[in-house]
Amino acid sequence: KINNSIETDNFHKKKEFEDIISYSRKNSSNIHLIGLLSDGGVHSHIDHLKEIILSLSDVKEKIFIHAFTDGRDVDPKSGINYIQTLEDFCEQNGGELSTVIGRYYAMDRDNRWERIHKAYDLISNGKGKKTENFSNEIKESYANNKTDEFIEPLVKLNKNGNPIHQLKPDDTIIFFNYRSDRGRQLTSVLCEENKSEFGMRPIISNFYTLTEYDEKFKKAKPIFKSKKLKNTLGEVISNNNIFQLRIAETEKYPHVTFFFNGGYEVPFEKEERILCPSPKVATYDLKPEMSAAEVTDNIINEINKEKFGFICLNF
């Protein structure tokens, strides 16, 4: 849908961009674009970011970009190339790269709020290593065997030695990831949910996501609204009065629930769910079995009950 709108020259005609420009002018406020900077095509695409910048060309001097380096869906040391590509594009078309951080922190989906906090502090408070050149910092990270996924927070300085951006309550944020699962946590603390126990609270009310991240979100507005799918397998099973079970560990939980149900977060009637916590390790190569044993124990127990006519499991 997004790519088609670009190809048919309809992307920049979206009313949401008109609203964002109008809001920015009315409030004399900035626009912050946040998301994964790569062309991996799993969570985001750099071409979408470019189109957003072009769509906001009327206020291009107000655009600041907060990039998450990838390293998982693309080469682990390709982030420097994407950053240089973006900086060249911005020089010609407007916008300015303001902060950089690895997706390990900004795109957690397993309730590791201490990771999200790093991204939150970077975007909201400019808390990170100060630099005048992102490429030099990333080269140094590579030299220290720290690849794109794990890039520590970086903040661009202006000619006066101050961070080039300062997020204010009247600003706008656009999260340009199109896949929802790794965008929810950061979105929630920036505009939806108070996480004071982790030092985070909502600070932006004018918040947009490229697609719908969570139907429970009240403030985050999707630019491309979800198409509600009918007669998914889970719905058909439910309509036939068959009990069904969804089971996975937290890292894979959205795949057997939200995604499997065609974008519906709420369980169908007679659908039950079991969530096993994923291990609390820095990276899963330290515990490659993850929570397979716990998932197995749970599923054996449920199978022996002979209650469910359908089981969806993800190790």
PLM feature segments, named:
Residues 1-315:
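Feature captures the catalytic ectodomains and active-site-proximal regions of enzymes
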